[in-house]
Amino acid sequence: MIYKVFYQETKERNPRREQTKTLYVTIDAANELEGRIAARKLVEENTAYNIEFIELLSDKHLEYEKETGVFELTEF
């Protein structure tokens, strides 16, 4: 499953929507909730990012992300 993680680069300032960034990770999980938990853990262990939201991408959403040219899987 591929998850889209919305984050701020630092935890030191209040989040601002205009500064929200995204990354994409692949997670093997039994269900969506376990995948979100695993994605959060993976990102928190490897970065100092302030995670705002984690979203499971549907096939159509993934296809759209690839078409827009912003899709790139992040590996830690």
Curated annotation (Swiss-Prot):
Keywords assigned by UniProt, alphabetized: DNA-directed RNA polymerase, Nucleotidyltransferase, Transcription, Transferase
Reactions accelerated catalytically: RNA(n) + a ribonucleoside 5'-triphosphate = RNA(n+1) + diphosphate
An annotated Gene Ontology molecular function: DNA-directed RNA polymerase activity
Keyword Transferase attributed: yes
GO annotations of cellular component type: DNA-directed RNA polymerase complex
Gene3D superfamilies: RNAP, epsilon subunit-like
KW Nucleus (keyword) present: no
Functional note: A non-essential component of RNA polymerase (RNAP).
Family to which the UniProt record says this protein belongs: Belongs to the RNA polymerase subunit epsilon family.
Name recorded for this polypeptide: DNA-directed RNA polymerase subunit epsilon
Species in which this protein is naturally found: Streptococcus agalactiae serotype V (strain ATCC BAA-611 / 2603 V/R)
Lineage, top ranks: Bacteria, Bacillati, Bacillota, Bacilli, Lactobacillales
